[in-house]
UniProtKB/Swiss-Prot annotation:
Alphabetical list of InterPro entries matching this protein: SmpB (IPR023620), SsrA-bd_prot (IPR000037), SsrA-bd_prot_CS (IPR020081)
NCBIfam families: PRK05422.1, smpB
A molecular function (GO) term: RNA binding
Assigned keywords, A-Z: Cytoplasm, RNA-binding
Protein name: SsrA-binding protein
């Protein structure tokens, strides 16, 4: 059975720049104008990351465009947004990100089947330059293989 997800924004660069070791789903605290803007699909999580401050986790650098009809009640486009996670998940994140080289990256933002906005986070370790070259070679080889199969 496939789970319903209406994707709002994806961070495709994260899969290229990081080794994703674990994925988590988190809720996100938003204002009304932000929700309306997300319903129109006006969001970018390309440069966003999450970090812990005390016993809370916040999403930084996530761009949600202003909603035109919100007038003076509009939101700041790049404000830090609190993520909603269970205490055990927060403790796991804090423990893993304390290790050198690990970070918390936003992978995708979507509406779940109950129409709630969720964000998929990845506990990730950065790739070195040679790892990136290797993944490019792998991708090219798979593309060439599919071309050869189609030609036969």
């Amino acid at each position: 059975m496939m789970e319903y997800k209406k994707i709002i924004a994806q961070n495709k660069k994260a899969l290229f720049n990081y080794f994703i070791e674990e994925r988590l789903e988190a809720g996100i605290v938003l204002k009304g104008s932000e929700v309306q803007s997300l319903r129109q699909g006006k969001a970018s999580i390309e440069e966003s990351h999450a970090a812990d401050t005390g016993n809370e986790v916040f999403l930084y650098n996530c761009h949600i465009a202003e909603y035109e009809k919100a007038n003076r009640f509009n939101h700041s486009t790049r404000r830090p947004r609190k993520l909603l996670l269970h205490k055990k998940e927060i403790n796991k994140i804090i423990g893993r990100t304390k290790i050198k080289g690990y970070t918390l990256v936003a992978l995708s933002m979507y509406f779940n089947k109950k129409n709630k906005i969720k964000i998929e986070l990845g506990i990730a370790k950065g790739k070195k330059l040679h790892d990136k070259r290797e993944s490019i070679k792998e991708k090219d080889w798979k593309r060439d293989q599919s071309r050869l199969i189609r030609q036969k």
